[in-house]
């Protein structure tokens, strides 16, 4: 299970600003009573969930919302989006960590994530799934996740060959040196 912390933060801080309500009013789809309700919205329900980091199984309830139907409907999509994304990442990370048979696995998903927030919360979810750290510096700062990484592929392009680039990187970072093969020249 991953994402519960973000779900709780979302629900605690959910509100509709004057600008939000004014935009909705401009759509001409909603009654003034509903818009007035939104302008004073505060979630009053209860959330029950299994703890983050727990193993989850198919058809197992992860989270239960007990609230008036209107409130539950207003938070449903966000809850599903958050939990679906982070549980997916944590599950995949757990499988990779298991396959590594005790070797540490680092998370480097930011460049492939579907947006900065997905990269940020994906890094957190990967660590919940067992990764030992992340290349995402903001995730390290926000979630106290160990930071680790490698050089950029462009690092190698600034040298005459891979060997020279690796040697210089190892000189600069003797205690934290992990080198990447330059993918366009991997056969060399």
Per-segment meaning from a language model:
Residues 47:
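Structured beta-strand/loop patches that form or line metal/cofactor-binding pockets in enzymes
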Residues 188:
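Short, glycine/acidic-enriched loop or turn micro-motifs at the edges of active sites
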Residues 29, 35-44, 53-58, 62-184:
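Buried, small/hydrophobic-residue-enriched core segments of structured protein domains
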Residues 1-25, 29:
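Intrinsically disordered, low-complexity, positively charged segments
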């Amino acid at each position: 299970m991953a994402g519960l912390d973000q779900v709780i933060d979302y629900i605690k801080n959910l509100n509709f600003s004057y600008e939000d309500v004014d935009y909705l009013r401009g759509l001409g789809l909603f009654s003034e009573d509903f818009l007035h309700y939104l302008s004073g919205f505060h979630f009053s329900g209860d959330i029950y969930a299994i703890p983050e980091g727990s193993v989850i199984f198919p058809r197992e309830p992860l989270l239960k919302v007990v609230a008036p139907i209107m409130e539950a409907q207003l938070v449903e999509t966000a809850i599903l989006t958050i939990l679906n994304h982070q549980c997916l990442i944590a599950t995949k990370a757990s499988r990779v960590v298991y396959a590594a048979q005790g070797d540490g696995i680092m998370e480097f998903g930011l460049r492939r994530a579907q947006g900065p927030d997905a990269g940020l919360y994906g890094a957190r979810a990967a660590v919940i799934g067992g990764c030992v750290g992340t290349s995402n510096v903001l995730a390290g700062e926000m979630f106290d996740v160990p930071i680790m990484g490698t050089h950029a592929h462009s690092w190698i392009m600034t040298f005459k060959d891979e060997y020279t680039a690796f040697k210089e990187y190892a000189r600069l970072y003797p205690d934290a040196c992990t080198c990447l093969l330059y993918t366009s020249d991997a056969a060399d």
